[in-house]
Each structure stands twice: as C-alpha cells, then as structure tokens.
A protein has these predicted regions:
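Transmembrane-helix signature of 12-pass secondary carriers
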Residues: 1-285
Length: 285
C-alpha cells in the first residue's frame, strides 16, 4: 500500500517567474549576439576589403570582449548589484547593435598591382570597437544572468529557472540564424547586413523595459546592509511568510560564513579535477 504526501505543492510566485524570464532574456541576447555576425560576415569582408586575418578579427573581437566581460562580471555584480549590471548589459547590447548597424563604410582604393584596400582605418576600427563592447555584454550576461536567477528563485525551483538562461542562449543563437535568413530574403542586398546587426536592438530595448519591473536580489541587499528591503522582496518571492523567514536566515548564515571564511583556494589539488571538468565542458560547448 502506497501513501501520498499530504503536504500541498507550493506554487511559484508570479514575481519569481517574471524575474527569471527577464534575466533569461539576457541569455537570449547573449546567444543572438554570438551568432548574428555569421550572416553579415561575407558582406563585411567585401565592404571593408578585409584580409583573412581581418575577417577572423571581426568575429574574434566579440569573443575577446566576452572574455573581458566575464572576468570582471562577478566583482562588478558584487559591488554595484545584480540588477544594475543587467541594465548595463542591455545598454551594451543595444548600443553595440545600433552602432555596428550604422557603422561607416570606407571608400575602397585599388592599387597598381590590383590590390584593393580601404582608404581609411576609421570605419573598421569603429565597427570593431562596438563589436568588442557587444562582446563585453555577452561576458557579463554569461555570469550575472544565472547569478540573478539563482538568487531570486526559491531553492525548490532554482535549478529549473537557472536552466532557462541556458535554454535562451541556445534559442538566441537559433533566432539569430532565423532572423538572418528572413532579412536576407526581404532586405536589399546592400543594406541586409545592417538590418541583421541592428535588429538585436529590439530585444535589448524590451529587456531594459522589463528589467524595470523586477527587483534586486535579497541576498545582495542583505550583504550590503539593506535588510528591510531584502525582507520585503523575499516575501514577494516566496509562497509563505515561513518560507521567506527561512530563506532570509539561510542567506544571513551564508553571508556570514563567506565573510568569515575568506577566499577559497580553488586552484589546489582538492578542486583540480572538478575545475578541469568545468573548463572542458564550457570550452567544448
């Protein structure tokens, strides 16, 4: 004879769902920005008279920005808050999209030997700078969006909601390829690349608008002495007063433990295998 638990299943508060969806839009922008350049790369190579190295750089420069963004993301989010950094992620994506879409195109000069080159380095430099800034947004998003979701979500649904960020990264890549295909069919050949790059400003604007409707995380607020605000937000993020109190207590204990424990020596024999596995999974992904 089997027995069923009499404990009622707790529903997920609407604010938790909304906050997780908004944060996951950062993942969507991440994926979109990573893939969208593929549709414009061939045209850019011709317009800017790029060498093989130059062609590689217009793709790689965003990855370099991603590395830089990821390195500083944790410290920035700890100092200024998760939500402000998410805001700047939206700004970087939006500005990067519009600037690359409106980037100037150089006059091409043909030398006596038939070699074609750009008359000025400014246009490609302009394009590279804003591709780099978009990459910084990708790096920040890869760190801050999952942190925000994990700190907003109750423990019982945390894994599922953090997974939403990863899902939207892949969905953003798919959306970029689909967007490129549609634009290639409906836009003029000479301007299609601008639309491909600029269209990302649309989800970036929606991300910024929706971001205004979600709160800072209670954990960050507690860590910075804003307990009253943290408690109020926690009550909106949980189903019961008891659950909220438990989460606040757990956060306080964790913050105190982190403060007392100092820095963890990750790069030691004890953690070597786990860290190596994490790096390999991320690299091959």
């Amino acid at each position: 004879m089997t027995t069923k638990s009499s404990a009622p299943t707790k529903s997920i508060p609407p604010l938790v769902i909304r906050s997780a969806i908004v944060a996951s839009l950062g993942g969507l922008l991440f994926g979109f920005d990573t893939a969208v350049i593929s549709g414009a790369e061939e045209k850019l190579t011709k317009l800017y008279a790029l060498s093989s190295m130059g062609e590689g750089m217009i793709v790689a420069i965003a990855t370099i920005g991603t590395i830089c963004g990821a390195i500083v993301a944790g410290k920035l989010a700890d100092r200024f808050g998760r939500k402000p950094i998410l805001f700047w992620i939206g700004i970087l994506f939006g500005v990067g999209a519009l600037a690359t879409a409106l980037a100037p195109v150089p006059t091409l000069v043909t030398a006596a030997d038939g070699t074609v080159s750009a008359s000025s380095a400014f246009p490609i430099t302009f394009f590279m700078v804003f591709r780099f800034l978009g990459g910084v947004g990708v790096g920040l998003s890869s760190v801050v969006a999952p942190i925000y979701t994990a700190e907003i979500a109750p423990a019982r649904v945390r894994g599922r909601l953090v997974g939403l960020v990863q899902f939207n990264i892949v969905f953003g890549i798919l959306l970029a390829y689909a967007s490129n295909a549609v634009i290639r069919e409906i836009a003029h050949e000479d301007t299609a690349w601008r639309w491909m790059l600029g269209v990302m400003a649309v989800p970036a604007v929606f991300f910024l608008i929706f971001l205004a409707t979600v709160p800072e995380t209670p954990r960050w607020l507690l860590a910075h002495g804003h307990e009253e605000r943290a408690v109020k937000i926690s009550e909106r993020l949980t189903s019961t007063q008891e659950e909220s109190s438990e989460q606040i207590a757990e956060m306080k204990a964790q913050i105190a433990e982190d403060a007392a424990g100092g820095k963890v020596a990750f790069f030691t024999r004890r953690y070597r295998k786990v860290i190596l596995m994490a790096f390999c999974i991320a690299m091959f992904n």
